[in-house]
From Swiss-Prot:
GO molecular function, one term: peptidoglycan lytic transglycosylase activity
Start and end residues of each stretch annotated as Non-LT domain: 22-264
Protein name: Membrane-bound lytic murein transglycosylase F
Localization per record: Cell outer membrane
Lineage summary: Bacteria, Pseudomonadati, Pseudomonadota, Gammaproteobacteria, Alteromonadales
SUPFAM superfamilies: Lysozyme-like, Periplasmic binding protein-like II
Length: 455
C-alpha cells in the first residue's frame, strides 16, 4: 500500500475513533455514573418536612428516604441543600444533582420539564390566615381584605399564575426572600395576611402556632414525588421506581412516614393553646428538676410525659388512685423509692426511673425512635398488655418491632375475640395510642421552643 494511502487510512481510522468516542451511545448511563462516583447527589430544601440538622446530625423525611435509596445502591449520600426550589431545578437541569427530593408537588408544568417518581405522599394546598384577625373567607373571591403571599417558583405560585385575570379583586405576590415556614410565621406576626401552604407543613407548624387557621382548600390530592432529569436514559429512573415499589409493599414507607408525621395529623386548638400557655407560665418552675432527674433521658421528653399525665400539677389525683406530677400508682411509687407522690421532685425522679425501666425491657433490637414510643406506651398501659399487642401484630402479619404496626393492633385489646387469646386479657388499648401521639406532639413542641431559645 502506498505511503499516502496508509496515511489517509490512519487519519480516517483516527477520525472514526474520535467520532465513536464522542457518540452519545458510548456515554455511561446515569446509574453507572452514580456507581462510578460512589455518591448519590440529592438536592433538597432546608425545612422541617424535608431536611434539617438536629445536634449536628442530618435529619428529615426526605433525608431518610434518600439515605435508604443510596444504601440500596451501595453508594454514599450527598445531600445538596438549598433554600430556593428554583435553585434545585436549575441544578437538576445542569446535572449538578441526580435527584431532587424536596416534598415537590407533581404539577403539570413541572411534569413537562422533569420526570417524577411514583408518588410517596398526597397533600392538599390550603389558604391560611391568623385566627381572630379577620372574617374567614370561603373562597378566593371573598379575599378582598388582604393579600396572599407565596414562595416564588412554588406550586402555590404556579396555581395563582394559572388564575390569570379571572378574579380581578384578588391581590397576591410571590417572594424569594422568605420560605414557606417563614411565611406561616409572618401570618402569625401580622406581616402577611394570607399564604398558601401544603397540608403537611401546616400540620407541623400548628403545633407551635395554634392560631394558624385554614380558610379553605384550593387543591386536593396533590402527588408528592422526586424529580429526575428528562431524557432517554432510564437507568436511575427505573431504580427509583423499583425502590418506591419495594418500600411501599414492605411497609417501610409507612414506617418512615409514621416516624416523621404520624403524630402531627391530629390538631386540637384548645389543647395546643393551653400547652403553649403552660410552657410559658408553669414549666419554668420545674425545668431544673426535670433536667436533674432525667438521667439518660431527654428532659424535654420527661416534661412532655408529665404534662400529658398531670398538666404539670404536682397535686393531681385521678379516680383510679394515681397521683402527682408523673401520676404514679402506689406500687410503682414504692418500687421507685418515692415516699410522697405529691412531692414534685420525688414524683419526677420516680417517673424517670420507671420510664428507664420500661426502656430497658423493650427488646434491644428495636431501634429508635420506636423503642421510646414502645416504652412510653408501656408506661401508660403496662408492659404485659404491650407485649400482648405485639403478639397480635405478629399473628396478623405485621411487624411487632414497629410502632406504626403495633399501634394499629393495640385497640384490639378491647375486643373479646382478641383479648381472650392473650396472657394479660382486656385493656383499653386505644388509650396508649392517643397517649403516645399527644406526648410526641408535646415533645416536638418543647424541642422547637428550646431551639428557639424560648425555654
Amino acid at each position: 500500500m502506498p505511503k499516502s494511502a496508509v496515511s489517509l487510512f490512519a487519519i480516517l481510522l483516527l477520525a472514526a475513533s474520535v467520532i465513536t468516542a464522542c457518540s452519545p451511545q458510548t456515554r455511561p448511563d446515569a446509574m453507572s455514573v452514580v456507581q462510578e462516583r460512589q455518591v448519590l447527589r440529592v438536592g433538597t430544601l432546608i425545612n422541617p418536612t424535608s431536611y434539617y440538622f438536629d445536634h449536628d446530625r442530618e435529619q428529615g423525611f426526605e433525608y431518610d428516604l434518600a439515605k435508604r435509596f443510596a444504601d440500596r445502591l451501595g453508594v454514599e449520600l450527598e445531600m445538596v441543600p438549598r433554600f430556593d426550589v428554583n435553585d434545585l431545578f436549575t441544578m437538576l437541569r445542569r446535572g449538578e444533582v441526580d435527584i431532587v427530593a424536596a416534598g415537590l408537588d407533581r404539577t403539570s408544568t413541572r411534569a413537562q420539564l422533569f420526570r417524577f417518581s411514583p408518588p410517596y405522599d398526597i397533600i392538599s394546598q390550603k389558604v391560611v390566615f391568623k385566627q381572630g384577625s379577620r372574617q374567614r373567607p370561603r373562597d378566593l373571591q371573598q379575599i378582598t381584605d388582604g393579600e396572599i403571599v407565596v414562595v416564588e417558583g412554588s406550586s402555590h405560585h404556579e396555581f395563582l399564575k394559572s388564575l390569570g385575570d379571572s378574579i380581578p379583586t384578588l391581590k397576591w405576590r410571590a417572594t424569594r426572600d422568605h420560605d414557606a415556614v417563614e411565611l406561616l410565621q409572618m401570618v402569625i406576626s401580622g406581616e402577611v395576611d394570607y399564604t398558601i401552604t401544603d397540608s403537611t407543613a401546616l400540620d407541623i407548624q400548628r403545633r407551635f402556632h395554634p392560631d394558624l387557621s385554614v380558610a379553605f382548600t384550593v387543591k386536593h390530592d396533590q402527588d408528592i414525588a422526586w424529580a429526575l432529569p428528562q431524557g432517554k436514559d432510564d437507568s436511575l429512573f427505573a431504580a427509583v421506581i423499583e425502590y418506591f415499589g419495594e418500600i411501599r409493599s414492605s411497609g417501610r414507607l409507612a414506617h418512615i412516614k409514621e416516624q416523621h408525621f404520624g403524630h402531627v395529623k391530629q390538631f386540637n386548638y384548645v389543647t395546643t393553646s393551653l400547652f403553649i400557655e403552660a410552657v410559658e407560665q408553669v414549666l419554668p418552675g420545674y425545668i431544673e428538676t426535670f433536667k436533674e432527674h432525667s438521667g439518660s433521658l431527654d428532659w424535654r421528653l420527661l416534661a412532655a410525659i408529665s404534662y400529658q399525665e398531670s398538666l404539670w400539677n404536682p397535686r393531681a389525683v385521678s379516680p383510679t388512685g394515681v397521683r402527682g406530677m408523673m401520676m404514679l400508682t402506689l406500687p410503682t411509687a414504692k418500687a421507685m423509692g418515692v415516699k410522697s407522690r405529691l412531692n414534685a421532685e420525688q414524683s419526677i425522679r420516680g417517673g424517670a426511673r420507671y420510664l428507664e425501666r420500661m426502656l430497658n425491657r423493650v427488646p434491644a433490637r428495636i431501634p429508635q425512635p420506636d423503642r421510646t414510643w414502645f416504652a412510653i406506651a408501656a408506661y401508660n398501659i403496662g408492659f404485659g398488655h404491650l407485649e400482648d399487642a405485639r403478639i397480635i401484630t405478629e399473628r396478623q402479619g405485621g411487624n411487632p418491632d414497629r410502632w406504626v404496626d403495633v399501634k394499629k393492633r393495640l385497640p384490639l385489646l378491647r375486643q373479646k375475640q382478641f383479648y381472650r387469646h392473650t396472657r394479660y386479657g382486656f385493656a383499653r388499648g386505644d388509650e396508649p395510642v392517643t397517649y403516645v401521639g399527644n406526648i410526641r406532639r408535646f415533645y416536638d413542641t418543647l424541642k422547637y421552643l428550646d431551639e428557639q431559645g424560648r425555654l
